[in-house]
Amino acid sequence: MQKLLQDRVAIVTGGAQGLGAAICHRLAREGAQVVVADLNLEGAEITSAQASAQTGCRTSAFKVDVTDESQVEAMIRHALAEFNRLDILVSNAGILISGPVEAFPAEKWRAVIDVNLYGYFLCAKHAARVMIGQGSGVIIQINSKSGKKGSYKNSAYAASKFGGIGLTQSLALELADHGVRVNAVCPGNLLDSPLWVDSLFKQYARNQGITEEEVRQKYIAQVPLKRGCTYDDVNNVIVFLASDQASYLTGQAINVTGGQEMR
């Protein structure tokens, strides 16, 4: 059976753990050769080795800070040196820091924008240079439901994600003539992910004055389908967007939220 992404070459930023690692594994299972890019090189190497061992696909790990343009350029050069082309960029690297606006440290607010929006721009810029030359390519940003609706005491993250959708649409318009499609995926709450378990439950419980379990139940109650988002939910959409099945889709920001954005 032909795999949807057979012999495509993909870069996944933020690929060392959590959703990023799950994306790398799924792309490899679909036949892609994957560069696992992350600030955490050790984690990227583990993900790369596991994905290759489980699928037989070629993978590679690369250390990158997506806010450093020279490092992003080096990441693209690495992909070309290893695999000779670049078909898919999944811009997944991101951070989330929440807090009340009146007490939000400006440097932390700026850090969220730098990673989530400026980092996406840099990766898309240098991937686009290659894809324009090839006459084909797919750029996918991992956005959020917070890119479409304001988020309580989460102004930096929401601002970065709203900006990401604007950037996605603008790049889609600019690159369409070159055969390059640009889309975003807007996941709901990945309640069982390391991001939530290790960080967000604690942040939100503190900011909202409730327990971590009450935070979980609050967010589940907001979802018409009454469950959290899973990695498979997100990856099903990523694979579709990266494949030829989505050849007529560009400039879209697809919700994967169980209907939460309607509440």
What function would you assign to each model-found segment?
Residues 124, 160, 168:
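Active-site helix of classical SDR
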Residues 100-101, 108-113, 201, 219:
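Substrate-binding pocket helix/loop in short-chain dehydrogenase/reductase
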Residues 2, 104, 149, 227, ...:
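Short C-terminal tail/terminal secondary-structure segment
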Residues 129, 173-174, 247:
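Alpha-helical segment proximal to the catalytic Tyr-Lys
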Residues 85, 90, 176, 181, ...:
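Short, small/polar-rich loop/turn modules that mediate ligand/substrate recognition or access, typified
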Residues 144:
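Residue(s) in the substrate-gating loop at a strand-loop-helix junction
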Residues 102, 149-156, 177-178, 226, ...:
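Active-site loop immediately N-terminal to the catalytic Tyr-X3-Lys motif
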